[in-house]
């Protein structure tokens, strides 16, 4: 199902201008955080414009929102809205809450950014290797009684990976026809069994057949490891008196030190607070194609090293005149918030890969089979990322007698455009997303 977007109404007016200025300021601030090469002194972003060409949107699926969209921020500035919603949830229906909403209390384009958590950030429940709210559509595992967290090494490897992609993402569950709200009956995924497994086992919890007191060679000696408890090593010795009734000669469970931080008393990361799901929450997956005239103006100052290092700086003006985009957009509506992001190429293939492969096998419009070159071009575009093409015009220096001093400085162009592509894919591609208050 295709959607026609009134692009002029959505991007014009005071709200559209404010949103364009926020995007310009955001991209400009990101360039100030980038380590520039030696031949570039600074990069400035001067303007951003949405253009006049609207994207083509085709609805692929309507499903339940991703679990990440329900996470509550610790520094959420919209505490008044949350308290108001809580009061309505206790005494009124959600439909009455929408009817009593005051539209003047919020700005249409007030938004917050949720970047992908790196080092020093709390991982979300969707990617948390040990959290109780781990999405069951990833890799369910069973917990081993007596061992906190089970014997799985998934948490060790996922700390370095940071996230999952491909068929291990929530999109794989959507493509498979399953629901995000459904849970697993695995005992290792619940809060109760996990807390029970994390408790230290007492002597009455130990199985007696596991304690071998007849063969001293079947286990390592504890005489050197625990010198303060000589009875532990003496009980398993073959030279002990079998007729003594001293209770210290009875076999005692050995105390072993564990390298697990959870066993040493270190607290595990606190799982984020999750908002309650509502029946009216929904999420739309759209196939978005865009070949428009979005414009952005940047200036990069180039340093010349002749006749001495950093002798003079020349301004290089870059004008982005349009982009070509092909990807899957995610729009989730939860209460008075709209969450927006794009999916990576791997996640998009999990949903649209079968359709694209079928399209390559179907004949073309003139009845002839499609050539293999067209399929190769599609694969190359898919490997290039969501932004398939960025059209740019550049000029350097001042104009003298109507002629430019230099044109098309390729090295600077490639660097700046690569950073624009990186900022887009890191800040707008899931698991990063943007939240708008509506």
Swiss-Prot record:
Keywords: Endoplasmic reticulum, Lipid transport, Lipid-binding, Membrane, Mitochondrion, Mitochondrion outer membrane, Transport. Residues 212-226, 354-364 have a biased composition (Polar residues). Signal peptide: none annotated. Residues 110-154, 185-277, 353-379 are annotated as: Disordered. It is a peripheral membrane protein. GO terms for biological process: mitochondrial genome maintenance; mitochondrion-endoplasmic reticulum membrane tethering; phospholipid transport; protein insertion into mitochondrial outer membrane. Residues 1-438 form the SMP-LTD domain. It is found in: Mitochondrion outer membrane; Endoplasmic reticulum membrane. The keyword Nucleotidyltransferase does not apply. Residues 227-245 have a biased composition (Low complexity). Its main location: mitochondrion. Residues 365-379 have a biased composition (Basic and acidic residues). CDD domains: SMP_Mdm12. InterPro entries: Mdm12, MMM1_dom, SMP_LBD. The keyword Mitochondrion applies. It comes from the Eukaryota. It holds the Pfam family MMM1. One of its GO terms (cellular component) is ERMES complex. Belongs to the MDM12 family. Component of the ER-mitochondria encounter structure (ERMES) or MDM complex, composed of mmm1, mdm10, mdm12 and mdm34. A mmm1 homodimer associates with one molecule of mdm12 on each side in a pairwise head-to-tail manner, and the SMP-LTD domains of mmm1 and mdm12 generate a continuous hydrophobic tunnel for phospholipid trafficking. Component of the ERMES/MDM complex, which serves as a molecular tether to connect the endoplasmic reticulum (ER) and mitochondria. Components of this complex are involved in the control of mitochondrial shape and protein biogenesis, and function in nonvesicular lipid trafficking between the ER and mitochondria. Mdm12 is required for the interaction of the ER-resident membrane protein mmm1 and the outer mitochondrial membrane-resident beta-barrel protein mdm10. The SMP-LTD domain is a barrel-like domain that can bind various types of glycerophospholipids in its interior and mediate their transfer between two adjacent bilayers. PANTHER family: MITOCHONDRIAL DISTRIBUTION AND MORPHOLOGY PROTEIN 12. This is Mitochondrial distribution and morphology protein 12. It comes from Penicillium rubens (strain ATCC 28089 / DSM 1075 / NRRL 1951 / Wisconsin 54-1255). The gene is mdm12.
């Amino acid at each position: 199902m295709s959607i026609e977007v009134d692009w002029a109404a959505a991007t014009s007016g005071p709200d559209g201008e404010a949103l364009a200025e926020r995007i310009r300021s955001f991209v400009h601030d990101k360039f100030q955080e980038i380590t520039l090469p030696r031949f570039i002194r600074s990069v400035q972003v001067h303007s951003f414009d949405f253009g006049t060409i609207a994207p083509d949107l085709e609805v692929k699926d309507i499903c339940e929102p991703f679990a990440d969209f329900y996470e509550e921020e610790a520094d959420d500035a919209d505490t008044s809205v949350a308290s108001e919603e809580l009061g309505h949830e206790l005494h009124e229906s959600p439909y009455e809450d929408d009817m009593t909403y005051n539209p003047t209390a919020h700005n249409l384009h007030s938004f917050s950014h949720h970047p992908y958590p790196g080092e020093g950030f709390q991982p979300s429940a969707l990617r948390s290797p040990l959290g109780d709210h781990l999405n069951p559509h990833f890799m369910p595992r069973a917990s081993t009684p007596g061992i906190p967290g089970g014997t799985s090494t998934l948490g060790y490897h996922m700390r370095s990976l940071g996230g999952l992609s491909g068929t291990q993402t929530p999109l794989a569950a959507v493509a498979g026809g399953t629901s995000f709200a459904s849970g697993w009956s695995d005992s290792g995924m619940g809060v109760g069994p996990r807390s029970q497994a994390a408790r230290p086992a007492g002597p009455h919890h130990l199985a007696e057949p596991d304690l071998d007191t007849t063969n001293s060679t079947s286990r390592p000696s504890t005489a050197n490891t625990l010198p303060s408890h000589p009875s532990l090593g003496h009980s398993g010795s073959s030279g002990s008196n079998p007729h003594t009734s001293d209770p210290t000669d009875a076999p005692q469970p050995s105390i072993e030190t564990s390298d697990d931080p959870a066993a040493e008393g270190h607290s595990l990361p606190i799982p984020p607070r999750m908002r309650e799901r509502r029946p009216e929450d929904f999420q739309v997956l759209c196939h978005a194609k865009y070949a428009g005239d979005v414009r952005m103006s940047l200036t990069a100052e180039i340093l010349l090293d002749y006749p001495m290092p950093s002798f003079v700086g020349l301004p290089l003006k870059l004008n982005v005149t349009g982009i070509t985009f092909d990807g899957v957009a995610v729009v989730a509506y939860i209460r008075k918030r709209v969450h927006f992001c794009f999916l990576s190429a791997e996640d998009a293939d999990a949903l649209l890969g079968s359709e694209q492969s079928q399209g390559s096998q179907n004949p073309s419009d003139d009845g002839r089979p499609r050539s293999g070159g067209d399929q190769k071009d599609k694969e190359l575009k898919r490997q290039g990322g969501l932004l398939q093409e960025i059209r740019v015009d550049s000029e350097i220096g001042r104009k003298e007698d109507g002629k430019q001093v230099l044109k098309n400085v390729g090295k600077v162009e490639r660097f700046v455009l690569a950073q624009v592509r990186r900022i887009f894919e890191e800040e707008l591609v899931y698991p990063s997303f943007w939240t708008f208050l509506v």
